[in-house]
Amino acid sequence: MGLYLDNASTTPLLPEVKDFIINNLDTFGNPNSSHKIGDRAKDIIDYSAEKVANLINTNAENIIFTSGGSASNTLAIKGFSEAMQHSKILYSPTCHKSIIEVSKRMFVSKSLNVDGTGRIIVSDLERLLEDNILYNTLVVVDLGNSEIGTVQNISLISEVVHRYNAYLYVDCTGSIPYIPLDVQKLNIDMAGFSAHKLGALKGCGVLFKKSDVPLSPLIYGSDDYFSGTQNVLGIGSLGVSAELYPNFYKKINSKNRSILYSELEKRLNNFYLVGSSEYRLPCNLNVCFPGVDSGNVVSILDDKYDIQCSAGSACNNYSSSLSPTLLAIKEKNPSSCVRFSLSGFEKKMELIDAAKKIASVVEGLRYWAEQNTM
């Protein structure tokens, strides 16, 4: 029996989402059409906007549907830069690659400094904001890093950002499956996330935007910020999961992560936690096995034991370059880090069995390495 421990890459469809898809396969209408078939599709879009808005404590008018998390990131950053003269982007180096790459392409941008766990050094952020007071600045951070699990102090960052009349965009794709998001309480100007991290369909994302935040469209063709015929089933599937997730938040905690880590400690020496132990997503376990190639660990666990995990962010798994996040925190063994991202609903015996198999693979690879260096 396999065990899927790669939920930070994507999640299986919720049963309720599957039911919604099956029941709406014939809802083929264009939501912009002015007839009853189009109206049915429009009803699904409106329903989903309300449910997503309720999930993050805002109004449906502030919800923009996109094609995914990367599209939301790009719309927020590029749209802000085009809408504001003398704009500058300050971004966290631990953010998703889509954020880093689009930020570098803006007229003026700068990477923020982080500590060894990946948390923003707020005093450095404040200095940069003070030095760049003449710019219209957008600060871009992730709430919870999907690779190393570190959670940022968004309340403090927001307070500092707005003290200098700057704007704050928060990428919540990695955190929203595990941590409730209240955009009003945190005083966030814009936030984005992806549907497929919440048990919904791929190809759908969300951008929350306060009504007074300046933004230019990413795709032109209508009066919308993200023009094109909307993905009705994808957006509808997100509406279903958004309605269910408040109950999930009540059940998700760090218990299963602690079980897996403690079981590894019983069986392995010379490994350590990557990221913050105190400020961490409850279902993220990124560990470093020095002397072992993380890609080999991932491949053997999958092929031999049907256990799925990751050697970092899924977006970087087919790249030969090292993880920008691990480089940003100055991880000394970046090619030996393995991410286990749990759902929070695994059974204890499944995790104990997984720990045995993980330890066996790591010990086997270390033994092989020793024999080949003699």
Where are these regions (language model features)?
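Pyridoxal 5′-phosphate
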Residues: 1-374
